[in-house]
Amino acid sequence: MTTTEQSPAAATGPDAPRRRGRRPLAAAAGLLSAGVALGAGELVAGLIGPQSSPVVAVGDTVITLVPEPVKAFAIATFGESDKIALVVGTLVVIALYAAVLGVLALRRRTAGVVGITLFGVVGAAAAATGPAGGPLDALPALAGALAGVVALLALMAPLTVPTAGAAQTRSDDDGAPLAERLRASLGAGDRKGAGLDRRRFFLTSAAAAGAAVATGGAGRLLLRRFDVGGARADLALPAPASPAAALPAGADLAERIDGLTPLFTPNREFYRVDTAITVPQIRPADYELSLTGMFGSPRSYTLDDLLGRSDVIERDITLTCVSNTVGGRLAGTARWLGIPLGAFLRENGIRSGSDQLVCRSVDGMTIGAPTRSALEVEDAMLAFGMNGEPLPVEHGFPVRMVIPGLYGYVSACKWLTGIEASTYDAFDAYWTERDWAAQAPIRIASRIDTPAPLRRFPAGRRAIAGVAWAQTRGIGAVEVRVDDGPWLPAQLSPQVDADLWRQWVLPHDFAPGSYQLTVRATSAEGEVQTEERAEPFPAGSSGLHSIRVNAT
């Protein structure tokens, strides 16, 4: 038998104390309604595509709209987990919003319905107008909003059950037309004389939670059919016509120095900085690279067209993100496989008036690369292989651009589907629109890997070691300073290629005490790394990496 509780406050007159007592349950109802909405949205997104997910769409919009200092702070604070932090932050905001709507709906259900509908419209607009969006991508958010409204009304009903004193009024209302009863239901809220049906509320809550989990889980399962991991694993890469230079024996100092960065970065550890909340999935059979703009004529290439070329090259190249701070880890080296970019552009009749290549990703991202670098940098390439395997999906599968000597935001377009030969006057790419420098050659950089900052270690002889890079120029020397002493020359790993970073090591005898260690590099052309500090925005960081350590 269902029991209905009447708040003592109802007997004494004022409704506020009774309403305050139900606010936690109303907030929970709002949260559960949001869960149902998100679950339904994910279910429909599973039928359409990952880009249509309401959370992803809103997150993409946030990335587009937030100021650059906020993005820089997120990357510096969360590193490669910045997207996870964004999704978590989005969900927290949704949860707070939903809880407030639940409390408002306790007084007037229309407020909750309007609030959920508004959020659905915002999500639908974000999905439909996103770089890779379309009208169909609005459906998950709209379906989620509808499910959320139904869930909210169902959850609010047990919180405002008419008591015996109000039963006659409700009985009289039953004879009213349907439209009037619906309006009354939406506007009713916490009416005078209403009670609380706890059992019904908890049963409805359990059903809502189950629906949210079931639909959300089903949506995740459906999204797996878009995964291209299997197709990537089956892709056969061609042998290079021009292999990478052979590495001399003992080239990787990390094999004998603990804590030193390896010469090559494993794919799973290679840094990833981009704006894609969900990694784009392109099936090899569907891939097409379009050339437009200032070429002899427009043309498209399939992946087989690129893989079947006779001029495939293999090169060892270090990439660096412009967001890398002094001493940061947003740099990595891989053995890349692809076709020479300069020859490819000339073959397609690129015109002399073009000074910018507008590179387009499948997710709508645009990267502006200087045409001159693409043509003149010897090892610039369209890459489809990384460290002996097809490009990882996270790093641009099936094709990306690699131009040594330039920060990634003006060269390393991932999931590349279009190249437009254009000019800087005619088009501002994504980052240029946000006031980053239009052209940004990588600055000379060096880093201390070991000992770690603030590390305590036994006094005695110990290796100070790290890496340094100056792509296209090469590293000619690395020096280390202990406290305010003289600059001491470090030993360098063999120079394999000017585009590849060099490891360095300096054995040093430490007496007990605290020490400040500083490193600087000199390019093979004789340019000394600047001591002037600069933040990553707008053209890359500069300054010397310095740490404090303690010998005991």
Where are these regions (language model features)?
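Membrane-embedded alpha-helical segments of integral membrane proteins
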Residues: 82-179
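Hydrophobic alpha-helical membrane-embedded or membrane-associated segments
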Residues: 26-37, 94, 119, 141-149, ...
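Helical transmembrane-bundle signal
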Residues: 38-42, 98, 123, 213, ...
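Structured, non-membrane catalytic/scaffold regions adjacent to prosthetic-group chemistry
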Residues: 43, 47, 52, 95-96, ...
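Hydrophobic multi-pass inner-membrane translocation pores used for secretion
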Residues: 178, 182, 212-226, 501
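Membrane-anchoring hydrophobic segments
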Residues: 1-110
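Actinobacteria-biased recognition of intrinsically disordered, low-complexity terminal regions
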Residues: 1-24, 163-192, 552
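N-terminal secretory signal peptides and thylakoid transit peptides that target proteins
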Residues: 188-209
